[in-house]
């Protein structure tokens, strides 16, 4: 007891102080038991004792497990191969292949402070996929065609990485992994098996497709042979059956190419056949070919709308070639006459102003006659409606109607169609209202040589004026019917006694006068031998007499 030092029995809590919240803090004057460290030699001794009492597993290298690698190849082909890994992330590299590039990328990823993600690496012939263990989310989904290189890490046993092309940024990226239970060599072997499966599928597609391409450097042209048509399911099953039969042959010498398996088309009586296109529709053409186009169809042409095939362009080209050959095409006459123009031959040797004035006077005359005829039609309807109330005692009105009947007969025999060279002049008239005989206006015609007819527009207007007959009365009466009959019957007798110019608008007054004569025979009958100068015109449009005025002038 005396040999022991005084400090061997110090309390364990000496040197410990409690904080504000009751926690224990270790100060500088802590207990010797907690502050004194063991020497390094003692640590080595303890470690050796622990290792000796533990059963240590023998380390077997991955190269001595070929049976597991064969199982990995079958698992890759069946898309059931998976490894537990830690995904370190990805980093950009500047080369598409090389073990040194992969090792440098893995070194950078291990030194980074990024926490690795535990996941499951699925390897198949389609691609590489990494699924998070906790969230089951897809971390990496890489198609096997975009992977350019893969290799294990020579500095780390469980390291593995591959280089691929990023689809968005088009950069070379290196993805790093650390295998949890397996080595990096096994992961690299599995990815190599995925490369082989992808290559076999591509070669099989090319063989089934049968498309070959050749490039001619002289013409810089590509030549494709074959078709990209995909085989049907029946054809694929037949090919698989043939391949199985060939592999099942025992000896290599007895392998004989047998006939292809006959494919039996299944028959379903309830199936409706799919509609197919006709052979005409499958022909290569510039436009879709329809059946015979009817008259009611909006499609009228059986050809494509090429520039050279248009009817307008074809006619224009044919006309140009015909004109160039010296045989101009004869265009058909138009149904509507064009606007008449004054010919320079018409005014040859004469003053052009006088010729234009003559043409303007003829047009003005026709317009005046047309307006007078329209006004007369309206007044005739009103007169026939009140025919029953006519005052037969008015001698002045009766005599005027009789004179108008005589002038109508003269108009039938002496009226001539106007021409462009005739200038009508109306003489001054002085009607007398006290006597029964009145002086009728006389029209003198200037004899001018007729060279040409009127233009088409003037001919049409003159034809309308000559052929227009008064409209039938709304309420036809006996007086009107008898008047028309008397007018036609008395035309011959009136033509003998009366001669001279006629007024075309006096013919409408004869009907009422003839009817009045038949109903009242006591009325005085005018003499047929009366001079034309002693008669008074019954035309209400030219009395009181005035000089003809030019209403308007048209310069053609």
UniProtKB/Swiss-Prot annotation:
Phenotypic consequence of residue 147 to A: Loss of binding affinity to Nak and drop in binding to single helical peptide
Biased composition (Basic and acidic residues): 7-26, 40-52
Keywords of the record: ATP-binding, Cytoplasm, Developmental protein, Nucleotide-binding, Nucleus, Phosphoprotein
Keyword Magnesium listed: no
Gene Ontology cellular component annotations, sorted alphabetically: basal part of cell; cell cortex; cytoplasm; nucleus
Region (Phospho-regulated basic and hydrophobic (PRBH) motif): 15-86
PTM annotation, UniProt: Phosphorylated by aPKC which lowers lipid affinity and promotes dissociation from the cell cortex.
Domain PID: 81-208
Chain residue ranges for the region called Disordered: 1-71, 519-556
Sites bearing Phosphothreonine, chain numbering: 430
Domain of life per record: Eukaryota
One Pfam family hit: NumbF
One GO-annotated biological process of the protein: neuroblast proliferation
PANTHER family in the cross-refs: NUMB, PID DOMAIN-CONTAINING PROTEIN
Protein name per UniProt: Protein numb
Organism annotation: Drosophila melanogaster
